[in-house]
UniProtKB/Swiss-Prot annotation:
Feature type site, description Important for hydrogen atom transfer: C228, C454
EC number(s) per entry: 1.17.4.1
Domain ATP-cone: 6-97
Signal peptide: none
Residue numbers binding GDP: S227, N437, E441, T626, A627, S628, T629
Record has Lipid metabolism as a keyword: no
GO terms for MF: ATP binding; ribonucleoside-diphosphate reductase activity, thioredoxin disulfide as acceptor
Protein name: Ribonucleoside-diphosphate reductase large subunit
Keyword set includes Nucleotide-binding: yes
Species whose genome carries this gene: Trypanosoma brucei brucei
Site (described: Interacts with thioredoxin/glutaredoxin): C833, C836
């Protein structure tokens, strides 16, 4: 019987027979550097051929081809690279390689809604493109588009690459990835083509990336490039509350995530002199904020609006606050679309530890508690207690256990330590810092006149692993480029509210983070918590910090120090590690987290230079979540261990299988990688710990985060914390958390001096997802990986150093309010961060 010839429809409307030879040739042409032993071209062509339908368009065929390759990625990670190349070639067919023509399409865009000219790039960028078109064409290198894996490319396609209207509601991507990088470089540096080329080359080769808002908006008519905004509640009045809400709505429609403190809002039942009535308190008000966050998104389906609400635990509405995100209870007492953080004074932790009482206060009758920290706070709080100003007195542990219960069920509230954040801040001369941002890595001063802002970028650490060693010199060079770029963004940024511009130009903070720390360890064959990995962790962050300080000092020599430099710790020769040492001496804390510098860099002469000429930026280092941009560059997220070695990641752009490429390469080298091994790893939820045929060294190297002691993660956070002048987004991971485990972790983090004790608590579902690819009988035969025991997770945390805080029963909740935790979290393209991450 003759095989029916299938016809496909070309882009010009003509039809032609489907030709497997053409498809095969196209794949073969993209196989450079791909392992042809594991990537079976013939099988791929066969499967695609079976999926071809009569009349299918060639664009749909391109999509089928790329998706078919992508879903084979669990067989070998090179399938992901091949799929990315197939998708990129499809994009290149419909876009121009001419930089000038590409910018012309964006500049001449006409809105389908208004039929008016609606350019997607700025007039400045269009003028530069016309003036320097030949030079820009020489700078750009389209071959680098073929370095993206499919997951990374689809993330770009979904949200980052600029689109134009094609009628009937259709939006078409007209920007190539390389053109996006060039747009960003031009948006930051304008006509300084030397800096444009430098930035473009480093970004397009994956050494660093600017944060998502910068990639979205640089070079556009409204270049809002900032990731994070911190807002102060203006005042405790209807005018103050709604003015602040309006301010947040304006920021949210075009910007990143927002952190806001509510410490000064009077509690429920508090007297209102103007009406002779009583206040409804925080909870009803926060439901209004919740609805605003839902309503005011950031346009075009790119990102949801998101607010993180911070509250100190002495506030009389704290119990209702802790219930707002829970899954059960009265709807009028819930606001689940907001995020919640605690701004915790040391005194509260001391009262919990000593089984003491805790007095809840109303800021209307016990004012100024949020305006002070340290001993000044303790003195004022205890004075109010003696004066009987409290609303009610409870056992401190009663509140503590409600905090833990909320974290087990929802993953929040975040835990930030007010005294550490303030004492170790280079902005402490400005006043008391009252909150962090949506992702807990930004710690900046706010007031009714100042909205704190931060511009972010992340450095891709795997790019600095060369020939089995880490290249600190190259890391320093790239960090200085990033610092100069972020400083430039401050001046070229579009600010949604005037208070943000005022603050950012005065203090000029930036936030430099990292991605791919776990990848760098894997490339160097270092298990995550190995002593050499811990040493590398310290050296990486010391190098980043000294490079950033040095670059900021060089900028100050040229342009002058930031306006409020005088009186800052840096102006007195105190950098971040000096503040850590000073804090520990003042508090009489042990010195177990103090380490000498790595010896590579000359800190003494740099500090002398800082005192002499100043710094251009008040703050520099802030390791943030990097969910979106690490997806783009193909790295593990930020500072975290691998969450799983095989999993499916769900984002706005689709569901994608992800496999640990480093593990696969090791298993190939050992001749252990095959379908049977792949199925075993899937059956064990991405763990290799229970697979005895894998050598112990490899099993240790590829432990997933659930198998790593959280004490080690906290120790490493404290080690690098000496070189982090803002804070860090530190997630903690417990498969089945108990109150005892959580208490142990929180107190250990606090005593180690961390500013952010916990971003999200990640836990695992009570039952494994059904694995449809496995025979149930085969699953029974598989050994299970070792679960974290209490001792394994925490070691000697708190042992012999403090009185054990009382145990409560294990809370039997999955982390329903936090992202899916059977692997990395479900995201909308930005993980738990949603808006703020790099």
């Amino acid at each position: 019987m003759l095989e029916t010839v299938k016809l496909v429809t070309k882009r010009d409307g003509s039809v032609e027979p489907y030709d497997e030879k053409v498809v095969r040739s196209r794949i073969v042409n993209l196989m450079s550097g791909i392992d042809s032993y594991y990537v079976d071209v013939d099988d791929l062509v066969r499967v695609v051929g079976e999926g071809v339908r009569e009349g299918m368009s060639t664009s749909m065929l391109d999509e089928l081809l790329a998706e078919t390759a992508a879903y084979c990625v669990t067989k070998h990670p090179d399938y992901g690279l091949l799929a990315g190349r197939l998708a990129v070639t499809a994009l290149h067919k419909t876009t121009t390689e001419s930089v000038l023509d590409s910018f012309r399409v964006l500049h001449e865009h006409v809105s389908q809604a208004t039929k008016r000219h609606a350019p997607l790039i700025s007039e400045e960028l269009w003028d530069i493109a016309n003036k320097h078109s030949a030079a820009l064409q020489q700078i750009i290198n389209y071959e680098r588009d073929f370095d993206f894996e499919y997951f990374g490319y689809k993330t770009l396609e979904r949200s980052y690459l600029l689109r134009v209207h094609k009628g009937r509601g259709v939006m078409e991507v007209v920007e190539r990835p390389q053109q996006m990088f060039l747009r960003v470089a031009l948006g930051i540096h304008g006509e300084d083509l030397e800096r444009v080329k430098e930035t473009y080359d480093y970004m397009s080769q994956g050494f660093f990336t600017h944060a998502t808002p910068t990639l979205f908006n640089a070079g556009t008519p409204f270049p809002q490039m900032s990731s994070c905004f911190l807002v102060a509640m203006r005042e405790d009045s209807i005018d103050g509350i709604y003015d602040t809400l309006k301010q947040c709505a304006i920021i949210s429609k075009s910007a990143g995530g927002i952190g806001i403190h509510m410490h000064n809002i009077r509690a429920a039942g508090s007297y209102i002199a103007g009406t002779n009535g009583t206040s409804n308190g925080l909870v009803p008000m926060l439901r209004v904020w919740n609805n605003t966050a839902r309503y005011v998104d950031q346009g075009g389906g790119k990102r949801k609006g998101a607010f993180a609400i911070y509250l100190e635990p002495w506030h009389a509405d704290i119990f209702g606050f802790l219930l707002l995100k829970k899954n059960t209870g009265k709807e009028d007492q819930r606001a689940r679309d907001l995020f919640y953080g605690l701004w915790i004074p040391d005194l509260f932790m001391e009262r919990v530890e000593s089984h003491g009482t805790w007095t809840l206060m109303d800021p209307n009758t016990a004012p100024f508690l949020s305006d002070c920290y340290g001993q000044e706070f303790t003195d004022l709080y205890e004075r109010y207690e003696r004066e009987g100003r409290g609303v009610r007195t409870i056992q401190a542990q009663e509140l503590w256990f409600l905090i833990l219960e909320s974290q087990v069920e929802t993953g929040v509230p975040f835990m930030l330590y007010k005294d550490a954040c303030n004492f170790k801040s280079n902005q402490k001369n400005l006043g008391t810092i009252k909150c962090s941002n949506l992702c807990t890595e930004i710690v900046e001063y706010t007031s009714r006149d100042e909205v704190a802002v931060c511009n972010l970028a992340s450095i891709a650490l795997p790019r600095f692993v060369k020939d089995g060693a880490f290249d600190y010199v190259a890391l320093k060079e790239v960090t200085k480029v990033v610092t100069r770029n972020l400083n430039r963004v401050i001046d070229r940024n579009h600010y949604p509210v005037c208070e943000a511009r005022y603050s950012n130009l005065r203090h000029r903070p930036v936030g430099i983070g990292v991605q791919g720390l776990a990848d760098a360890f894997a490339l160097l064959s270092l298990p995550f918590a190995h002593p050499e990995a811990k040493k590398l962790n310290r050296q990486i962050f010391e190098t980043i910090y000294i490079a950033a300080v040095e670059a900021s000092t060089e900028l100050a020599e040229k342009d002058g120090p930031y306006e409020t430099f005088k009186g800052s710790p840096a102006s007195e020769g105190k950098l971040q590690f000096d503040l850590w040492d000073e804090e520990r001496r003042i508090r009489g804390m042990n010195e177990d987290s103090v380490h000498s510098h790595c010896g590579l860099w000359d800190w003494d002469s740099l500090k002398e230079r800082v005192v002499k000429v100043g710094m251009r930026n008040s703050l520099l280092i802030a390791p943030m979540p990097t969910a979106s941009t690490s997806q783009i560059l193909g790295n593990n997220e930020c500072i975290e261990p691998f969450t799983s070695n095989i999993y499916v990641r769900r984002v706005l752009s689709g569901e994608f299988p992800v496999v640990n490429k480093h593990l696969v390469k090791e298993l190939i080298r050992l001749r252990l990688w095959n379908d049977d091994m792949r199925r075993k790893i899937i059956a064990l939820n991405g763990s290799v710990s229970g697979i005895k045929e894998i050598p112990e060294r490899i099993r240790e190297l590829y432990k997933v985060v659930w198998e790593i002691r959280q004490k080690d993660l906290i120790d490493m956070a404290a080690d690098r914390g000496r070189y982090i002048d803002q804070s860090q987004s530190l997630n903690l991971f417990l498969a089945t958390p108990t109150s005892s485990q959580l208490t142990s972790m929180h107190f250990y983090s606090w005593k180690k001096g961390l500013k952010t004790g916990m971003y999200y608590l990640r836990s695992q579902p009570a039952a494994d997802a059904i694995k449809f690819t496995l025979d149930p009988k085969a699953m029974k035969e598989l050994p299970k990986p070792d679960k974290q025991s209490k001792e394994e997770v925490h070691g000697s945390v708190g042992r012999g150093k403090r009185k054990r805080v009382g145990e409560k029963p294990t809370a039997n909740h999955s982390n329903a309010g936090a992202p899916n935790l059977n692997g990395p979290p479900d995201t909308d393209g930005d993980g738990g961060c949603l808006n703020c991450g790099s």
